[in-house]
Amino acid sequence: MAKENPSNYKTLQIWIKKGHRMYSYFQECCHNAKNMYNTTNFYIRQVYTGLTQEKELQPLQKEVLDHIHKNIGKMNDTQLLAYQKKLEKEKLKPKEEQKEITCNLFSEPNFEKPYVDYNFLDALFKAMIQNDYRALPTQCSQSIMKGVFQNWKSFLASLKDYKKNPNKYAGMPRIPKYIRSSEKEILYTNQDCIIKNSRFLKFPKTKLQLNIGKLGFTEGKLKQVRVIPKYNEYVVELVIDVPSEQQIIEENARYMSIDL
């Protein structure tokens, strides 16, 4: 049946099985995605638990806070440089079109504010040249980080509500957990992945390309690519913005897919 779809998105799938020449690439990427998730969660947890407890800091909590203390100057140097560049760019515009530019400098978390936000941690990882952050394309790492921060936002909101309405809960909301599995799905933007000649999908950090010719891709703009570990295989999902005003959706809601 035809279904109205303002965004006109179409999803195509390819299953990558063991033995495929790109299997090990996707395996490494999904493993790195898990590491990036857990590293982000680790830094947020150590800051939060370290600065909301009355007892002496544990070694890992102290280690993270030391990393922050050592890199806060470098982080703010980068902020100042970005501010100066924006200011110079703004001065080139006619005066009536110029916008006010502010310089947002970072401050270390403390007992009054025992949190780090996304912008702070992203700047810290860049200043540290953090290995897990650099193992993936920057936008992939940032997407994973935003997912972790969303979980923390939900946790803190639940904790706040719990303190006001404890009877609504079976127990105190628990701090976001680490991923125990060996892999996590990864999301690539259309800046990281590119379709070549309507036939090959190019991924970052590899010369290998995925043949998507059998999917019948002929037109539309690639929006994003998801790689999902499933049953010891990998599902590569291409989200395409198709030019048609209507998208044909099968009654069973299945995706078009092929096995490789």
Regions flagged by a language model, labelled:
Residues 1-260:
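Nucleic-acid substrate recognition interfaces
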